[in-house]
Amino acid sequence: MRLTIAAAAAALALCLPAQTFAQDAAKGETVFKKCQICHEVGPTAKVKVGPILNDVVGRKAGTLPGFAYSPAMKEAGEKGLAWTDESISKYLENPRDFVPKNKMAFVGLKKEDERADVIAYLKKYTAPK
C-alpha cells in the first residue's frame, strides 16, 4: 500500500510544472548587499576580495583579468564552466560544493527565489553578446 501511494505521488509530481521564480532585479539588488563585502558591480567597480561581477553572465569561470582565482576555479573554467543562469544559481546555493576548493567563503543563498533575483540584478551589469 505504501509503495502504491509513493508511486502515485511520484507520478503526480512529474505531471506538475516545475516551480519557477520570476527574476526581480530590484529584490536582487537588496540580496546582493550580502555580496558587496567582497564583490562590486557597475561602471566604477573595483576588484576587492572577490572579482568584479560586471559581465559575469556568459563569462567562462576563472577568467576575469586582474583577479587571482583559485586553481580550482581556473580549472573549472578550463574544463568548460561558464556562468549561465543555471550554473550561477547552483554556485550561489553552495559555492564549496559546486567548485570544491574555491576561495569563496560565502555559505550560499539557500532560497531559489533570492538566487534568481541576484541573477537578474547581475544581468543589469552584463552587456548583450
Language-model segments: which ranges?
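Electrostatic cytochrome c docking/interface patches
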Residues: 15-32, 42-44
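Bacterial N-terminal signal peptides
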Residues: 7-15
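The canonical Cys-X-X-Cys-His
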Residues: 32-41, 118
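Histidine kinase transmitter module recognition
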Residues: 38-41, 45, 98
